[in-house]
Amino acid sequence: MARTSESSPYVEFDRKQWRTLRKSTPLVLTEEELYGLRGLGEQIDLEEVAEVYLPLSRLIHLQVAARQRLFAATATFLGEKHPDQQVPFVIGVAGSVAVGKSTTARVLQALLARWEHHPRVDLVTTDGFLYPTAELNRRGIMHRKGFPESYDRRKLLRFVTEVKSGAEEVAAPVYSHISYDIIPGQYHLIRQPDILIIEGLNVLQTGPRLMVSDLFDFSIYVDARIEDIENWYIQRFLALRKTSFSDPDAHFHHYAGLSDRDATAAAQEIWHNINRPNLVENILPTRPRATLVLRKDANHSINRLRLRKL
């Protein structure tokens, strides 16, 4: 049985317990499709999709239906003309750099898009809402890129508000990991999705005023030991020398020719000066706000889950 307590707002599962909640949910992904969704260094396989993500997609499917009934009840109370109009269900996915939250978001998008009643599922990353490099330099916070203050939080909040309010088309800025900057004039157009997934480092943050996390209907925090995340970050950094960093136009092209030893030292410096402080100070404290925490072992596999029941 799942571990719970009458006085706790959470119920905890190991993977064996969680997988029983899949019920008859069919596996709709192929190995080839999963390969295209898997991030660099990720070890996710179809077994993990079946045992972790299918029960999760079933839970979200049930919550989408329940949330629509709640929205309809409020609309009826307000006397609106179309109380049954669908309101986009917004999911937040948070976690550290290199923890695998992007893979989680992509796999979830693929599974949810195949449910019968909500085929349109859009995914937007908060990278597009970083301030452009010129603005970060003007503010003197280029070294704080990825920290909460490096994002245009008002713009992100306005974007999600417009999507959830039913706007016919809303534009999300696009970020390039090659140029390490916002791409001028390029946008990801969101057109009235049934479900919108917002993935980013700091999406669960709160504040004295309305925050984007206040608009989430469901949220996921991808968790792991800090030491494991550091190791994954370093391994990913080493691998990027042969992929993204090898592009002559890449912002980090100067790392491409480093030896393993020098690249490891560079990655450790970035981790300890930027990514670890951001995780400890800003990201990790938001974990209790998540509806569901996915806990990874050192081999990247999800083996424990914590669901907020209240």
Curated annotation (Swiss-Prot):
Annotated keywords: ATP-binding, Coenzyme A biosynthesis, Cytoplasm, Kinase, Nucleotide-binding, Transferase
Record's GO cellular component terms: cytoplasm
SUPFAM superfamilies membership: P-loop containing nucleoside triphosphate hydrolases (SSF52540)
Organism of derivation: Rhodococcus jostii (strain RHA1)
Alphabetical GO biological process terms: coenzyme A biosynthetic process
Family recorded in the similarity comment: Belongs to the prokaryotic pantothenate kinase family.
Matching CDD domains: PanK
InterPro entries: P-loop_NTPase, PanK, PRK/URK
Positions with a binding annotation for ATP: G95, S96, V97, A98, V99, G100, K101, S102
GO molecular function: ATP binding; pantothenate kinase activity
Pathway noted in the entry: Cofactor biosynthesis; coenzyme A biosynthesis; CoA from (R)-pantothenate: step 1/5
Primary subcellular site in the record, as a coarse category: cytoplasm
Domain of life: Bacteria
Reactions catalysed: (R)-pantothenate + ATP = (R)-4'-phosphopantothenate + ADP + H(+)
EC number: 2.7.1.33
Protein name: Pantothenate kinase
Location of the protein in the cell: Cytoplasm
HAMAP family to which the protein is assigned, alphabetical: Pantothen_kinase_1
